[in-house]
From Swiss-Prot:
Subunit structure: Component of the cytochrome c oxidase (complex IV, CIV), a multisubunit enzyme composed of 14 subunits. The complex is composed of a catalytic core of 3 subunits MT-CO1, MT-CO2 and MT-CO3, encoded in the mitochondrial DNA, and 11 supernumerary subunits COX4I, COX5A, COX5B, COX6A, COX6B, COX6C, COX7A, COX7B, COX7C, COX8 and NDUFA4, which are encoded in the nuclear genome.
Residues given in the record as Mg(2+) binding sites: 198
Cofactor note text: Binds a dinuclear copper A center per subunit.
Protein's organism: Propithecus tattersalli (Golden-crowned Sifaka)
Keywords: Copper, Electron transport, Magnesium, Membrane, Metal-binding, Mitochondrion, Mitochondrion inner membrane, Respiratory chain, Translocase, Transmembrane, Transmembrane helix, Transport
The keyword Mitochondrion is annotated on this UniProt entry: yes
TM annotation in the entry: 15-45, 60-87
Main enzyme class: translocase
Protein name in the entry: Cytochrome c oxidase subunit 2
Coiled-coil residue spans: none
Amino acid sequence: MAYPVQLGFQDAASPIMEELLYFHDHTLMIVFLISSLVLYIISLMLTTKLMHTSTMDAQEVETVWTILPAIILILIALPSLRILYMMDEITTPSLTLKTMGHQWYWSYEYTDYEDLSFDSYMVPSSDLKPGELRLLEVDNRIVLPTELSIRMLISSEDVLHSWAVPSLGVKTDAIPGRLNQATLMTSRPGIYYGQCSEICGANHSFMPIVLELVPLKHFEEWLLSMF
């Protein structure tokens, strides 16, 4: 989860998020090197008084500054495409969770089980218990098993929403009349927080998401308690 005055990403809790963090560091290093080179060239231009008045063209330099950016773009594009394909890859899911966005709450349906669905509203600040997080707690948490592939089906009943959980590297738009799909998998039990990430009206800021990821045995016990 996030911490006060945090500048970096949240800790990765899924393989996809780990790949995204590696790609971010890879791209940031390239940007840093290019920025340093540009600043160095600018500083040379500002501090030197030498000028090559007889130089009309420099084909070697033009060749280098055409080929080098192309190579850099390829070094950025290939890892990016790899992660995009990983995010869209759908294996045989062990569980399917249907998510519907509303103004301004979420509803969830475990489609593999009959009559297992509920709405999830934000807990008002006046009802929070000690240790609970303001604007992030909900009355009904999503409970999911760890180490299993979970398919998320995401849509909306009214306007555009976006179902996002940063620690899991998931952000999928909820669009009325359209069913989007995402895959979740994590080996780390815990409670993970997210929020609606698409401006959807007056109470957009009050649509938190809470996932409680537990071992399979505890998930089965939770299922029995829901019937």
